[in-house]
Amino acid sequence: MRIIVIGAGLAGLTAAWELRKRGHEVSVLEARARVGGRTWSLRLGNGAITERGGEYVFPTEFAIRRLSAELGVPILSHNVRYARRTVDGRHVSFAELEATTEQITETLRGMLADGLTRVSVEDAHREALGPDYQQHPVYRRMVTSLANDPNLVSAASAFLYDPDADQPFIDDGGRFVGGNQSLAIELARRLGAAVRLEHPARAIDQSSSGVEVTLADGSTLHADAAVIAVPLPILRSLRLGFALTPGQDAALSHRIMGTAAKLGVPLAAVDDDIALQSTDLSWWSWRSLSADGEHRIPALSCFAGSRATLDALHTEAGPGRWVSELQALRPELVIDGDVLLTDWSDDPWTRGSYSAASLDWTPADLDAFDVPAGRVAFAGEHTGLEQTLNGAVVSGLRAVTAIEAVERLTETSGGPA
């Protein structure tokens, strides 16, 4: 089949790569002048690579690790306490982290058993950890990573449906040696001329015989099927001339887009804390292991999550306030060159960072995108519960399975109704 993939982030490129390997003719349309979407790597003035977007590849995230091995894109450990950051002078032990997480989970189960509904991440932490819960390192880590208001995010989605729940917890994460964008760049290199940059799609329609994609310049492209792999706000802005399945409509209505910012800071000197969390705002900074396995890279990476935190850091006005807060938290920091701020709320092709499950989320949403809507499948972190680089890859693979259903239906009946 001829298949159009809209979006050249990790989700779309994974789908395109797998579809080509299975003998399909693919075309990938990307609005930007680069591939990678929310993976975006640049070098700071001192030569250190910084990630403007997605950062961590965790040990049990097998889909993206399998893909990186296939493509020969190596992974290096960050060697950072991702889940056990220093907060107010201490970080929790491995055992305390596991015990606290179990305490919150069991408290949540009890709340739900008592008939409570629409229980938020905030509610679960408050009930489990008591009046000082907002100062607890486990709370501070989770709400930072949510990139959303924890009062609006489903606790059940966060604690009861973890896709890695059956895997051992390992407090480490990896990064691609050449920058996290390097995986997307290698996929695009192998796909070659099939990837078309600066080709934003505006509308998509379908019939029993195929799909039609309308570009921003008014031109149209035709194919047998399509995969839409764009961020949630962009998906909502596309003109779709067809209906989604009821399950897909419901699942999308249960997603809320978060926002986040990153700060890359070249340095000449800093303290030795590799993972330091703000005590009152949802941001943290870390320093990754270098490729020599001994030293740290000459840069700090910082992540801030949620609209309230970005407003408090005045990111709309530039990096100045955030840099001041960072230097107050790390008084030994000596900055060596220009810092690099990336505010994803300002990005026209994402309009935010990544999504979360709202209080209306239900477990039925989990399977909504296993099937296509006619001849169209969907990919992207918003189609599942993994808001990670691996989640993007998993969603691309899921979309391939959905497209194969289109192919089977086409072969047996001449096309979807």
Label for each model-derived stretch:
Residues 37-64, 157-165:
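Glycine-rich active-site loop/strand segments that organize a redox cofactor
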